[in-house]
């Protein structure tokens, strides 16, 4: 994932900055507790494709 792209992407729900989880290829919105997938180096910024974070995952990402 190109870090210059990360600097301009925000959560489509609340416009918050996103945290890049390189290991799991996810973009995390801590505010909305959503994880957007990255597929073939392309962020999928559709709310319908986002995964709601579990309580354990929320704690992991802070």
Swiss-Prot record:
InterPro entries: Trm112-like. It holds the Pfam family Trm112p. GO terms for cellular component: cytosol. Belongs to the UPF0434 family. HAMAP family: UPF0434. This is UPF0434 protein Fphi_1862. It comes from Francisella philomiragia subsp. philomiragia (strain ATCC 25017 / CCUG 19701 / FSC 153 / O#319-036). The lineage of its organism: Bacteria, Pseudomonadati, Pseudomonadota, Gammaproteobacteria, Thiotrichales.
């Amino acid at each position: 994932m190109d870090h210059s792209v990360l600097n301009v992407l925000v959560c489509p729900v609340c416009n918050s900055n996103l945290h890049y989880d390189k290991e799991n290829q996810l973009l995390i919105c801590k505010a909305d507790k959503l994880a957007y997938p990255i597929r073939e180096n392309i962020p999928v910024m559709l709310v319908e494709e986002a995964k709601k974070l579990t309580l354990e995952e929320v704690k992991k990402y802070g």
